[in-house]
Amino acid sequence: SRGVRVYAFEPEASNYNILCQNIRLNNMGNRITAYCAGNLDYDGFSVLNIAQDRDVGPGGSCHTVEEEKNFDLTNMKVTFKQGINTVMLDTFCKQMNIIPDHIKMDVDGLEHRVINGGVESIQKAKTVIIELNTNLKEHNDAVSKMKSLGFKLDETQVKQALRKGGTFLNVGEHLFYK
């Protein structure tokens, strides 16, 4: 009723299949369009690296586009490379004539590269939610980049969102707003 449209990107084939099934089962095909592609800082062909120690079945995560890196940017032992297309957010938004209101980004480590490929589109958004790892220089630089694009960040929200222990220590959603 509010004219909301969602454009989702899921490069991993099994997860993309589940995403499309859920869109169909919930009769949301008129509002949600899913693309089996990865976002990065260039348009073209690449690979999705699937790690040995990660779940490779439907719902699995922590796979990365192009770079053989884990979510924390440490080296990944890759067991499978799935061919994929990559698209920059700016290319997608221009080609589809989209001005995004809200963007959610969770690409398991390479968020800084997605931001670099989407500066024009990100600047037009009202809010951007990005899962970032505060242990990483690249992700702290991404926070600075978002601020340079005119976004604000609620440090209290970030502090509450950060994981307090385990594998994903200091990883959490950052809500940027104007």
Where does each model-flagged region fall?
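Phosphate/nucleotide-binding beta-alpha loop and adjacent structural elements of enzyme active sites
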Residues: 1-178
